[in-house]
């Protein structure tokens, strides 16, 4: 697991990561406004999109709270790091992924606030196909290898008319649950973060908004098919909402509540809409 630290504080348990003296270079009235101490909170993320966290840090400056991002490339790592006390929060996964990880691995972590929906989209290898209609028998389609996003990708292929899945498997079917291939595509599984890199070896790949954005792809402009995230027509949408997660013992931590509240502001909504141009959809209760 590759890991990039923005800051080097450490800590675990109920307290935020670290508390340090605020900088002393500010002068005059500005110095008077600075809090005496800064509470640093380490947040685990996956991918390179972080503009919203810059806005959050600006909003929390007067409260003496500073978010420092720990960037992971392995989707299995942030929940393990959170559970083990290596980070304070994480913000990289949807509710279905979190529920599956807790059930499978016994993590004592919970979501404490909604953030965004990162729609899955089908991206084409432009050297091979130019539209969804051109996908044919034998074409390789790459999908995420983890259970929740892999199942989500199979449901997207079903929605697009390529396969039929066993309805009893709900929203997390596996390849073994495909009951019919309407087009005899060759479905290959790969770790989510690698899908954009292997696109040249496929006809198409199914990539979520975060990994797509990191790879320079935009679901609005570059995809040939995007997941239906309208809750009125897709009952699974509530489980696709990304969340901020904390250890269960910290679910009522006041500092963490302020971070969630800062995320749920018009300023952060504007940053997400301006920076990501449709790659992410704000999904907290009053985001509309």
Residue ranges and their predicted role:
Residues 5-29:
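Bacterial lipoprotein signal-peptidase II cleavage site
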Residues 40-42, 46-71, 77, 81:
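Short, polar/charged alpha-helical segment
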Residues 57, 75-106, 214-216:
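Pocket-flanking alpha-helical
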Residues 69-80, 169-197:
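Short helix-initiation/N-cap motifs at beta->coil->alpha
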Residues 100-112, 126-128, 201, 206, ...:
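Ligand-binding "clamshell"
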Residues 112-163, 269:
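A conserved helix-loop-strand patch within extracytoplasmic ligand-binding domains
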Residues 119-132, 239-253:
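A bilobed periplasmic-binding-protein/Venus flytrap-type ligand-binding module shared by bacterial periplasmic
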Residues 149-158, 262-284:
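Periplasmic-binding protein-like
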């Amino acid at each position: 697991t590759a890991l990039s630290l923005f800051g080097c504080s450490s800590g675990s348990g109920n307290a935020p990561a670290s508390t340090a003296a605020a900088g002393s270079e500010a002068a005059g009235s500005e110095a008077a406004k600075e809090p005496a101490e800064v509470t640093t909170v380490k947040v685990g993320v996956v991918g390179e999109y972080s503009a919203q966290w810059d806005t959050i840090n600006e909003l929390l400056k007067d409260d003496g709270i500073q978010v420092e991002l720990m960037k992971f490339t392995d989707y299995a790592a942030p929940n393990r790091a959170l559970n083990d006390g290596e980070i304070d929060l994480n913000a990289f996964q949807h509710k279905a992924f979190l529920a599956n990880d807790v059930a499978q691995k016994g993590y004592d972590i919970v979501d404490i606030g909604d953030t965004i929906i990162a729609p899955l989209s089908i991206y084409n290898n432009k050297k091979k196909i130019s539209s969804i209609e051109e996908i044919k028998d034998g074409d390789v389609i790459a999908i995420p290898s983890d259970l929740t996003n892999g199942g989500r990708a199979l449901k997207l292929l079903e929605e697009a008319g390529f396969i039929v899945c066993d309805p009893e498997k709900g929203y997390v079917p596996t390849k073994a649950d495909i009951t019919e291939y309407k087009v005899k595509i060759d479905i290959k599984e790969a770790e989510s973060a690698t899908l954009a890199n292997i696109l040249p070896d496929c006809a198409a790949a199914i990539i979520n908004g975060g990994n797509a954005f990191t790879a320079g792809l935009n679901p609005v402009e570059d995809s040939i098919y995007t997941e239906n995230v309208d809750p009125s027509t897709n009952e699974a949408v509530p489980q696709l909402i990304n969340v901020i997660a904390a250890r269960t013992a910290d679910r009522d931590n006041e500092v963490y509540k302020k971070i969630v509240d800062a995320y749920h502001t018009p300023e952060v909504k504007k940053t997400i809409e301006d920076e990501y141009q449709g790659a992410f959809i704000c999904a907290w209760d009053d985001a509309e």
